Amino acid sequence: IANDLPIQVNDRNTELELLYIDDLIDEMIAALEGREHRCEFEDTTAVPDVNGRYCYAPVTHHVTLGEIADLLDSFSEQSSTLVMPEIPHGSFAKKLYSTYLSYLPEDRIMYPLTMNSDERGSFTELLKTRACGQISVNISKPGITKGQHWHNSKWEIFYVVSGHGLIQERKIGRDKDGNLYPVRNYEVSGDKIEAIQMLPGYTHNIINLSETEDLVTVMWANESFDRLHPDTFYENVDD
């Protein structure tokens, strides 16, 4: 799969017990230091026993061929979908992904991204997740204002990593006296990287204050963009 070749699985339900190399090395080092784990065996199953006759590695993973194949397919598709599979700490998926990448050929290490460019600059999606949103990078040309919209449920965090800009936010609606809510101003710079949260129900923009340099902003959103349900409504911050 790392070489983009087809695989054949005759029985997806076949279960394997797999031991990751790092877990094996950790246990070997522990044994050398007198901290080994001991067991007895019932058939092929290790039963922990501090007085057991055998040393064993306690961390193994029971997975089916079908589960392995599905995970490998999701790893292979990541470069085209940008969706990072869930890889919790210590999980089989995390260990298998590291193993998969170690077999990746040189011509698959780098892959293209879609830059949505116009006269104002560009916007590029970098990475998506199923549970924790997506990461993008926005480039604004000198003097350009981007944004001027708000979201009902979506929220974002902006990180200016290069350039000098101004982020503005204003709560949608009016106060009890019928006045627009005040605009909040946050001056940002790549010389001092800070996190600015774009709140739900607040229209916001980002302005490149430089006359010569691009403004580069890394953006995290709590959900991946859905063209059918964009949850984006245009309203100027300074109306």
Residue spans for each PLM region:
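NAD(P)-dependent short-chain dehydrogenase/reductase
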Residues: 1-34, 68
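Short beta-strand His + acidic residue motifs that chelate non-heme Fe in jelly-roll/DSBH
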Residues: 147-149, 167-169, 195-198, 204-211
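Double-stranded beta-helix
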Residues: 177-182, 207-239
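Glycine- and acidic-residue-biased ligand/ion/polar-headgroup-sensing regions
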Residues: 153-175
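Mid/C-terminal beta-alpha module of Rossmann-like enzyme folds, strongest
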Residues: 23-26, 30-115
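Short acidic-glycine-tyrosine-enriched beta hairpin
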Residues: 173-201
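A short beta-loop-beta micro-motif enriched in histidine and acidic residues
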Residues: 132, 144-157, 190-192
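A short glycine-rich, His/Asp/Glu-containing loop-to-beta-strand
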Residues: 109-148
